[in-house]
Amino acid sequence: MNQPTTAPPRTRTEPKTERPRLWKVILLNDDYTPREFVVMVLKAVFHMGEEKAYAVMLTAHRRGACVIAVFARDIADTKAKEATELGKAKGYPLYFTTEPEE
């Protein structure tokens, strides 16, 4: 005799996807890098317009630091490194860093 078979109940589980933690890219002020060069780097690496780049540069100059943008960690690290390397290549102490957004 055949016994009836019962299939286990089908359940659909949706994987929980969490948003990646975001990281801030921060421009640190120094007294040696020319303002024009900082603006050029902001335009080249962060695709800012002239006015926005100038405003960000002035904010960093007046406050000592300024948040440039917020990205996923790998993008933030890459952009901070690229911008810092542009300064190094010209002999300037221009420095960008990253930290987690709260």
Language-model features and meaning:
Residues 1-102:
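Terminal domain-initiation and capping elements
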